[in-house]
A protein has these predicted regions:
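Carbohydrate-active catalytic/glycan-binding domains of CAZyme proteins
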Residues: 1-306
Protein backbone atom coordinates (compact mmCIF):
# COMPACT_ATOMS: atom_id res chain seq x y z
CA UNK A 1 0.00 0.00 0.00
CA UNK A 2 1.45 3.38 -0.97
CA UNK A 3 2.31 5.70 1.88
CA UNK A 4 1.17 8.66 -0.19
CA UNK A 5 -1.95 8.84 -2.34
CA UNK A 6 -2.32 10.87 -5.53
CA UNK A 7 -4.93 13.62 -5.17
CA UNK A 8 -5.87 15.25 -8.48
CA UNK A 9 -7.71 18.51 -9.07
CA UNK A 10 -8.91 19.72 -12.48
CA UNK A 11 -8.84 23.31 -13.66
CA UNK A 12 -10.12 25.37 -16.58
CA UNK A 13 -7.26 27.26 -18.24
CA UNK A 14 -8.34 30.45 -20.00
CA UNK A 15 -6.38 29.73 -23.17
CA UNK A 16 -6.69 27.48 -26.19
CA UNK A 17 -4.81 24.21 -26.19
CA UNK A 18 -2.95 25.41 -29.30
CA UNK A 19 -1.69 28.47 -27.37
CA UNK A 20 -0.59 26.25 -24.47
CA UNK A 21 1.28 23.88 -26.80
CA UNK A 22 2.94 26.85 -28.54
CA UNK A 23 4.08 28.25 -25.18
CA UNK A 24 5.00 24.81 -23.86
CA UNK A 25 3.38 25.56 -20.52
CA UNK A 26 0.20 26.67 -18.77
CA UNK A 27 2.37 29.14 -16.82
CA UNK A 28 1.01 32.68 -17.08
CA UNK A 29 -2.47 31.77 -18.28
CA UNK A 30 -5.36 32.45 -15.86
CA UNK A 31 -7.04 29.32 -14.54
CA UNK A 32 -10.05 28.43 -12.46
CA UNK A 33 -10.09 25.33 -10.26
CA UNK A 34 -12.98 22.89 -10.18
CA UNK A 35 -14.54 22.45 -6.71
CA UNK A 36 -12.43 20.76 -4.02
CA UNK A 37 -13.26 17.28 -2.76
CA UNK A 38 -13.14 15.74 0.71
CA UNK A 39 -10.19 13.89 2.20
CA UNK A 40 -8.86 11.04 0.03
CA UNK A 41 -11.28 11.89 -2.78
CA UNK A 42 -10.57 13.61 -6.07
CA UNK A 43 -11.80 14.63 -9.50
CA UNK A 44 -9.56 13.96 -12.52
CA UNK A 45 -9.38 13.42 -16.29
CA UNK A 46 -11.47 16.42 -17.44
CA UNK A 47 -12.99 16.50 -20.93
CA UNK A 48 -15.39 19.16 -22.15
CA UNK A 49 -18.06 20.05 -24.68
CA UNK A 50 -19.77 23.39 -25.26
CA UNK A 51 -23.49 23.32 -25.93
CA UNK A 52 -25.98 26.23 -25.94
CA UNK A 53 -23.47 28.57 -24.33
CA UNK A 54 -22.62 26.16 -21.52
CA UNK A 55 -19.45 24.19 -20.88
CA UNK A 56 -20.06 20.58 -19.84
CA UNK A 57 -17.01 19.23 -18.02
CA UNK A 58 -16.95 15.44 -17.63
CA UNK A 59 -14.62 14.06 -14.95
CA UNK A 60 -13.69 10.92 -13.10
CA UNK A 61 -14.76 11.06 -9.46
CA UNK A 62 -12.82 8.80 -7.12
CA UNK A 63 -12.88 7.93 -3.42
CA UNK A 64 -10.00 5.85 -2.03
CA UNK A 65 -12.43 4.18 0.39
CA UNK A 66 -14.58 2.88 -2.49
CA UNK A 67 -11.79 2.43 -5.05
CA UNK A 68 -14.04 2.42 -8.12
CA UNK A 69 -14.11 5.54 -10.29
CA UNK A 70 -17.35 6.89 -11.75
CA UNK A 71 -18.17 9.73 -14.15
CA UNK A 72 -19.73 13.09 -13.24
CA UNK A 73 -20.55 16.23 -15.21
CA UNK A 74 -20.07 19.79 -13.98
CA UNK A 75 -21.93 22.44 -15.98
CA UNK A 76 -20.61 26.01 -16.29
CA UNK A 77 -22.35 29.01 -17.82
CA UNK A 78 -20.68 31.44 -20.23
CA UNK A 79 -19.17 33.33 -17.26
CA UNK A 80 -17.76 30.07 -15.85
CA UNK A 81 -20.15 29.91 -12.92
CA UNK A 82 -20.95 26.36 -11.82
CA UNK A 83 -24.69 25.90 -12.42
CA UNK A 84 -25.16 22.13 -12.15
CA UNK A 85 -23.38 18.94 -11.16
CA UNK A 86 -24.68 15.41 -11.75
CA UNK A 87 -23.52 11.78 -11.78
CA UNK A 88 -23.68 10.45 -15.32
CA UNK A 89 -22.15 6.96 -15.50
CA UNK A 90 -21.49 4.20 -12.99
CA UNK A 91 -20.53 0.61 -13.74
CA UNK A 92 -19.45 -2.38 -11.64
CA UNK A 93 -15.87 -1.65 -12.76
CA UNK A 94 -13.59 1.37 -12.52
CA UNK A 95 -14.30 4.19 -14.98
CA UNK A 96 -12.09 7.18 -15.73
CA UNK A 97 -10.89 9.33 -18.67
CA UNK A 98 -14.42 10.25 -19.91
CA UNK A 99 -13.50 11.38 -23.41
CA UNK A 100 -16.60 13.04 -24.87
CA UNK A 101 -16.92 14.10 -28.50
CA UNK A 102 -19.43 14.73 -31.27
CA UNK A 103 -19.34 12.69 -34.48
CA UNK A 104 -21.68 11.17 -37.06
CA UNK A 105 -24.62 13.18 -35.72
CA UNK A 106 -24.33 11.84 -32.15
CA UNK A 107 -22.57 12.64 -28.88
CA UNK A 108 -20.24 9.90 -27.67
CA UNK A 109 -18.22 8.99 -24.61
CA UNK A 110 -15.29 6.58 -24.66
CA UNK A 111 -14.29 6.13 -21.01
CA UNK A 112 -11.28 4.21 -19.76
CA UNK A 113 -12.56 0.85 -18.45
CA UNK A 114 -9.81 -1.71 -18.96
CA UNK A 115 -10.83 -3.59 -15.81
CA UNK A 116 -13.95 -4.66 -17.70
CA UNK A 117 -11.59 -6.27 -20.26
CA UNK A 118 -13.27 -4.43 -23.10
CA UNK A 119 -13.55 -0.99 -24.66
CA UNK A 120 -17.14 0.27 -24.68
CA UNK A 121 -18.30 3.27 -26.71
CA UNK A 122 -21.34 5.00 -25.15
CA UNK A 123 -23.93 7.15 -26.91
CA UNK A 124 -25.77 10.03 -25.24
CA UNK A 125 -29.48 9.23 -24.92
CA UNK A 126 -30.28 12.40 -22.97
CA UNK A 127 -27.22 14.67 -22.87
CA UNK A 128 -25.45 15.12 -20.51
CA UNK A 129 -26.74 12.64 -17.93
CA UNK A 130 -27.99 9.52 -19.74
CA UNK A 131 -25.71 7.26 -21.78
CA UNK A 132 -26.13 3.81 -23.30
CA UNK A 133 -23.52 1.30 -24.45
CA UNK A 134 -23.48 1.53 -28.24
CA UNK A 135 -20.51 -0.52 -29.40
CA UNK A 136 -17.71 -2.77 -28.17
CA UNK A 137 -14.53 -1.72 -29.98
CA UNK A 138 -12.45 -4.81 -30.79
CA UNK A 139 -8.68 -4.26 -30.78
CA UNK A 140 -5.44 -6.26 -30.57
CA UNK A 141 -5.13 -5.59 -26.81
CA UNK A 142 -7.31 -4.44 -23.94
CA UNK A 143 -6.93 -0.68 -24.29
CA UNK A 144 -5.98 1.93 -21.70
CA UNK A 145 -6.97 5.61 -22.17
CA UNK A 146 -8.17 5.03 -25.75
CA UNK A 147 -8.28 8.34 -27.60
CA UNK A 148 -9.96 8.72 -31.03
CA UNK A 149 -9.58 11.43 -33.65
CA UNK A 150 -10.94 11.76 -37.21
CA UNK A 151 -8.22 12.95 -39.57
CA UNK A 152 -7.37 12.51 -43.23
CA UNK A 153 -10.65 10.78 -44.03
CA UNK A 154 -10.43 8.05 -41.40
CA UNK A 155 -10.61 7.43 -37.67
CA UNK A 156 -7.45 6.91 -35.66
CA UNK A 157 -7.39 5.47 -32.15
CA UNK A 158 -4.42 5.84 -29.78
CA UNK A 159 -4.12 3.69 -26.65
CA UNK A 160 -1.71 1.80 -24.45
CA UNK A 161 -1.98 -1.89 -23.65
CA UNK A 162 -3.30 -3.29 -20.37
CA UNK A 163 -1.34 -6.54 -20.85
CA UNK A 164 1.38 -5.71 -18.32
CA UNK A 165 1.61 -2.91 -15.77
CA UNK A 166 4.64 -1.23 -17.46
CA UNK A 167 2.86 -1.33 -20.85
CA UNK A 168 0.06 0.88 -19.53
CA UNK A 169 2.56 3.71 -19.17
CA UNK A 170 4.94 3.02 -22.02
CA UNK A 171 3.54 1.07 -25.01
CA UNK A 172 1.58 3.23 -27.46
CA UNK A 173 -0.65 1.44 -29.96
CA UNK A 174 -2.64 2.76 -32.92
CA UNK A 175 -5.67 1.43 -34.79
CA UNK A 176 -7.65 2.90 -37.68
CA UNK A 177 -11.14 2.57 -39.16
CA UNK A 178 -13.39 4.12 -41.79
CA UNK A 179 -16.23 4.45 -39.29
CA UNK A 180 -16.31 5.00 -35.56
CA UNK A 181 -18.13 1.69 -35.05
CA UNK A 182 -15.32 -0.09 -36.86
CA UNK A 183 -14.09 -2.57 -37.81
CA UNK A 184 -10.80 -1.30 -36.37
CA UNK A 185 -7.48 -2.45 -37.84
CA UNK A 186 -4.46 -2.50 -35.50
CA UNK A 187 -1.40 -0.77 -36.94
CA UNK A 188 1.21 -3.29 -38.18
CA UNK A 189 3.96 -1.42 -36.27
CA UNK A 190 2.25 -1.81 -32.87
CA UNK A 191 3.45 -0.88 -30.38
CA UNK A 192 4.38 2.15 -32.46
CA UNK A 193 6.20 3.82 -29.57
CA UNK A 194 7.71 2.41 -26.37
CA UNK A 195 8.71 5.18 -23.98
CA UNK A 196 7.55 5.73 -20.41
CA UNK A 197 7.98 9.48 -20.99
CA UNK A 198 5.75 9.82 -24.07
CA UNK A 199 3.31 6.99 -24.79
CA UNK A 200 0.15 6.95 -22.64
CA UNK A 201 -2.55 9.30 -24.00
CA UNK A 202 -3.48 12.22 -21.78
CA UNK A 203 -6.19 14.29 -23.42
CA UNK A 204 -8.01 15.34 -26.56
CA UNK A 205 -5.94 15.28 -29.76
CA UNK A 206 -5.32 18.52 -31.64
CA UNK A 207 -4.62 19.09 -35.32
CA UNK A 208 -1.90 21.72 -35.75
CA UNK A 209 -0.50 22.53 -39.21
CA UNK A 210 -2.28 19.47 -40.61
CA UNK A 211 -0.70 17.06 -38.13
CA UNK A 212 -2.24 15.24 -35.18
CA UNK A 213 -0.79 16.36 -31.86
CA UNK A 214 -1.62 13.91 -29.08
CA UNK A 215 -1.11 14.94 -25.45
CA UNK A 216 0.79 12.07 -23.81
CA UNK A 217 1.80 11.44 -20.22
CA UNK A 218 5.36 11.56 -18.99
CA UNK A 219 5.44 8.88 -16.28
CA UNK A 220 9.24 8.67 -16.05
CA UNK A 221 9.42 10.36 -12.63
CA UNK A 222 5.95 9.62 -11.26
CA UNK A 223 2.59 8.52 -12.65
CA UNK A 224 1.18 11.45 -14.62
CA UNK A 225 4.16 13.65 -13.82
CA UNK A 226 3.82 15.84 -16.92
CA UNK A 227 2.17 16.17 -20.33
CA UNK A 228 4.15 16.22 -23.57
CA UNK A 229 2.81 16.98 -27.07
CA UNK A 230 3.43 14.05 -29.43
CA UNK A 231 3.25 15.21 -33.06
CA UNK A 232 2.54 12.56 -35.70
CA UNK A 233 4.95 13.44 -38.50
CA UNK A 234 4.03 10.31 -40.52
CA UNK A 235 0.76 8.47 -39.91
CA UNK A 236 -0.55 6.03 -42.51
CA UNK A 237 -2.06 2.54 -42.27
CA UNK A 238 1.46 1.08 -42.52
CA UNK A 239 3.82 3.81 -41.25
CA UNK A 240 4.21 5.78 -38.02
CA UNK A 241 6.71 8.44 -37.03
CA UNK A 242 6.38 11.01 -34.27
CA UNK A 243 8.26 13.80 -32.55
CA UNK A 244 7.79 14.58 -28.87
CA UNK A 245 7.90 18.04 -27.31
CA UNK A 246 9.05 19.25 -23.93
CA UNK A 247 7.34 18.30 -20.68
CA UNK A 248 4.58 20.57 -19.40
CA UNK A 249 4.51 20.56 -15.59
CA UNK A 250 2.27 22.40 -13.13
CA UNK A 251 3.31 26.02 -12.51
CA UNK A 252 4.50 26.93 -9.01
CA UNK A 253 1.38 29.09 -8.67
CA UNK A 254 -0.79 25.94 -8.60
CA UNK A 255 0.70 24.83 -5.25
CA UNK A 256 0.11 22.48 -3.54
CA UNK A 257 -0.96 20.77 -6.81
CA UNK A 258 2.54 20.72 -8.30
CA UNK A 259 3.45 17.01 -8.34
CA UNK A 260 1.92 16.05 -11.70
CA UNK A 261 -0.16 17.14 -14.70
CA UNK A 262 -1.72 14.33 -16.72
CA UNK A 263 -4.60 15.71 -18.81
CA UNK A 264 -4.68 18.43 -21.47
CA UNK A 265 -8.09 18.60 -23.15
CA UNK A 266 -9.05 21.20 -25.70
CA UNK A 267 -12.50 22.76 -25.19
CA UNK A 268 -12.87 25.59 -27.67
CA UNK A 269 -11.53 28.85 -26.19
CA UNK A 270 -10.42 27.12 -22.97
CA UNK A 271 -8.42 24.05 -22.03
CA UNK A 272 -9.06 21.52 -19.27
CA UNK A 273 -6.16 20.18 -17.22
CA UNK A 274 -5.65 18.35 -13.94
CA UNK A 275 -2.79 18.60 -11.48
CA UNK A 276 -1.86 16.53 -8.47
CA UNK A 277 -0.55 16.67 -4.97
CA UNK A 278 0.01 13.67 -2.72
CA UNK A 279 -1.54 13.04 0.68
CA UNK A 280 -0.02 10.94 3.44
CA UNK A 281 -2.10 7.81 3.99
CA UNK A 282 -2.56 6.76 7.62
CA UNK A 283 -3.76 3.38 6.37
CA UNK A 284 -0.57 3.00 4.39
CA UNK A 285 1.46 4.09 7.41
CA UNK A 286 -0.28 1.60 9.72
CA UNK A 287 0.40 -1.28 7.31
CA UNK A 288 4.04 -0.19 7.06
CA UNK A 289 4.29 -0.02 10.88
CA UNK A 290 2.96 -3.58 11.24
CA UNK A 291 5.40 -4.76 8.57
CA UNK A 292 8.34 -3.12 10.36
CA UNK A 293 7.22 -4.50 13.75
CA UNK A 294 7.21 -8.02 12.31
CA UNK A 295 10.78 -7.54 11.12
CA UNK A 296 11.87 -6.56 14.66
CA UNK A 297 10.24 -9.56 16.34
CA UNK A 298 12.79 -12.20 17.41
CA UNK A 299 12.46 -15.23 15.19
CA UNK A 300 11.48 -18.44 16.96
CA UNK A 301 14.09 -21.13 16.88
CA UNK A 302 12.90 -24.11 14.93
CA UNK A 303 12.23 -27.06 17.21
CA UNK A 304 14.30 -30.15 16.59
CA UNK A 305 12.57 -33.44 17.02
CA UNK A 306 14.62 -36.38 18.20
Amino acid sequence: VALRKDIWRPAIVMATAEAIVARGSIQGFPLMWLPPMGSFQFLADPFGLWRDGRLYVFVETYDYRVRIGAIEVLVYDADFRLVDRQPVLNEAWHLSYPLVFEAEGETWMLPEAHRSNRLTLYRAVDFPTRWEPAQIIELDHVAVDATPVFHGGRWWLFYTSADREPDKMSALHVAYADRLAGPWTPHPMNPVRVDVASARPGGMPLVIDGRIVLPVQDCSRTYGGAIRPLTMTVLTPDRFEAEVGDAMVPPASSAPFVEGLHTLSTAGPVTLVDMKRTELSLHGLSIEAVREAKKLRPKRRASVRG
